[in-house]
Amino acid sequence: MSIMIPAWVDGTLIPVEKLEAHQRGLRHKAVSVFIIRNGEVLLQQRAMGKYHTPGLWANTCCTHPDWGEDPAACAARRLDEELGLTGIPLEHRHHLEYRAEVGSGLIEHEVVDVYVGYAPENVECAANPQEVMATKWSDASDLRAALSKYPDHFTPWLRIYMTEHADKIFGRDLEFSYSV
């Protein structure tokens, strides 16, 4: 089944097959979510079956909206599909653009709407094994240390978010303002 995502071709936003967008390095829309609980952020380790960046740690969830899908609705949908998380209100925090090679000749050139949500202390994830192989909660200090010591364990976009956009994503919620 072909997944059509919003991408710009010759300056016009049109539906493009997701893999084609990555193969051609087309600028396309994306959504990223960070869920926070008690001063920690929920990270996911991408499933080994993912066609790029398998096994790497990423933010809580990230995806591409379907053609015509509202970004906020997309963020809530993917939280449920990837992690079984529902009912967590999401706040739009930032809009950013980045370009990164993600292996196997694929390129993410994303225009991203970033959302933050706050989970109750008793929240439980039900990770979809086709999407996520592990989850963990990390405080700012631990994530800082891991990003510095093992940058290749993390997706390019998480490294970009945390080194270039943390202030705008987290504000005063977490102490993620730093340089690696």
Go through each PLM region and give its residues.
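Local beta-strand/beta-hairpin segments that build beta-sheet-rich folds
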Residues: I14, R93-H95
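Acidic, metal-coordinating catalytic segment for phosphate/diphosphate chemistry
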Residues: M1-S32
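A glycine-rich, hydrophobic loop/mini-helix early in the fold
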Residues: A30-H64
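A structural signal for short, well-ordered beta-strand segments
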Residues: V33, C61, H92, D113-Y115
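Nudix hydrolase/Nudix homology domain
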Residues: L19, L96-R99, L106-V180
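The catalytic Nudix box helix
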Residues: L43, T60-R93
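A short, polar/proline- and glycine-enriched secondary-structure boundary/capping micro-motif
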Residues: G25-L26, H52-A58, K136-D139
